[in-house]
Each structure stands twice: as structure tokens, then as C-alpha cells.
Regions:
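Membrane-interfacial helix termini and adjacent extracytoplasmic/periplasmic loops
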Residues: 2-40, 111-115
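Non-cytoplasmic
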Residues: 4-5, 11-12, 89-127
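Structural signal for membrane-spanning alpha-helices in multi-pass inner-membrane proteins
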Residues: 7, 46, 50, 152-159
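Alpha-helical membrane-protein architecture signal
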Residues: 29-33, 37-40, 44, 62, ...
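Transmembrane alpha-helices
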Residues: 48-51, 55, 59, 73-106
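Short hydrophobic faces within alpha-helices
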Residues: 61, 65-67, 137
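Interhelical loop and adjacent transmembrane-helix boundary motif
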Residues: 108-153, 158
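Short cytosolic juxtamembrane segments of multi-pass membrane proteins
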Residues: 158-166
Length: 166
């Protein structure tokens, strides 16, 4: 559904697609950056909702305390609010990354499948499976799992380092 909506908005014969093509020489569909854009559109709500929850649960007395000490709103945001909400932002980012890594539908609709140009791991797995290359598909699934594991390990190590004060 999201991929179809993106095609309706940014297709080569649609007003936005034509505008970008005529004014900037940029084709917004069937290329590698349309795959990235589709993944972001699909994954962003997960990141936003999780980060928003972190900001909504922020203890405002911390900000008020900093204000009484004469700190600016910018200082309070970066030195008080962001550190307190860091875990929620990080959790949302990891959720969005995981969702984007496995994104197939919108990506295949707006970017297509051109090996070496617009193929993502998810679209490659599908194409290999469709052509009965289960070993090839499994290799890419393992690559996907390894990437996910490395990202989660890095996030966990970063969190441990932050908690230890390093």
C-alpha cells in the first residue's frame, strides 16, 4: 500500500515526479535512492512513536530546575532532555533500522529490482526464492541476520559504555 501511494505521488508521470525531473533532473522512482526513501517512509513511524514516548515521559522538573539555574532552552534540550531520552531514541532507531532492513513491499514497488542497482537484501531474497535458488536466498538471509546481530551488539555495547560513564 505504501509503495503504491509513493508511486502515485512520485511516479514519472505524476505532478511531483514531473516537477523533480523537470526542475532538478532527478527521477524519483526505479533507482537506488528510491529504495532508501521507501524504507525510510515505512520505518519512520516506528522510530517516531518510540522517540515520542521517551520525550512524553521526560520529567519536566529537570528542565525547570535547569531554567532556575539560568540555562537556555537550547542548553536544556541538548544537556538535559536529550540524555534523558537517549534510550528511547536509540530503541526507536533500532526498530526503524530492523524494519527498513526487512522492507520488501514499498521498496519493490518504487525501486523495482535491478541487480547491482536497486536490489535490496529483501528483494534479492525474494527473487532468489522465486527462481528456486534456496541456497542463494539463505545466504542473503544469513547476511541479513549477521548485519542485524552486529547492529544490536554495537547498540548494547554503546549502552553499557554509556551506563559505565565512558
Amino acid at each position: 500500500v505504501v509503495g503504491y501511494f509513493l508511486l502515485l505521488l512520485f511516479g514519472a508521470k505524476r505532478p511531483l515526479g514531473l516537477f523533480f525531473l523537470e526542475h532538478f533532473g532527478v527521477k524519483l522512482v526505479m533507482n537506488w535512492y528510491s529504495a532508501i526513501f521507501a524504507s525510510i517512509v515505512v520505518a519512520f513511524p516506528l522510530m517516531y512513536r518510540t522517540a515520542r514516548g521517551a520525550f512524553e515521559s521526560f520529567d519536566e522538573t529537570l528542565a525547570w530546575s535547569a531554567q532556575t539555574l539560568g540555562q537556555s532552552n537550547t542548553w536544556i534540550f541538548w544537556r538535559v532532555r536529550m540524555p534523558c531520552c537517549r534510550q528511547g531514541i536509540l530503541a526507536g532507531t533500532v526498530l526503524a533500522f530492523a524494519r527498513a532492513l526487512g522492507e520488501y513491499g514499498a521498496t519493490s514497488m518504487i525501486a523495482g529490482y535491478t541487480p547491482g542497482r536497486t536490489a535490496t537484501i529483501a528483494t534479492t531474497v525474494y527473487q532468489l526464492w522465486r527462481t528456486n535458488d534456496e541456497l542463494g536466498a539463505m545466504r542473503w538471509v544469513l547476511v541479513d541476520i549477521v548485519i542485524s546481530a552486529v547492529v544490536l551488539l554495537a547498540v548494547n555495547l554503546l549502552e553499557k559504555k554509556q551506563k559505565a560513564g565512558g
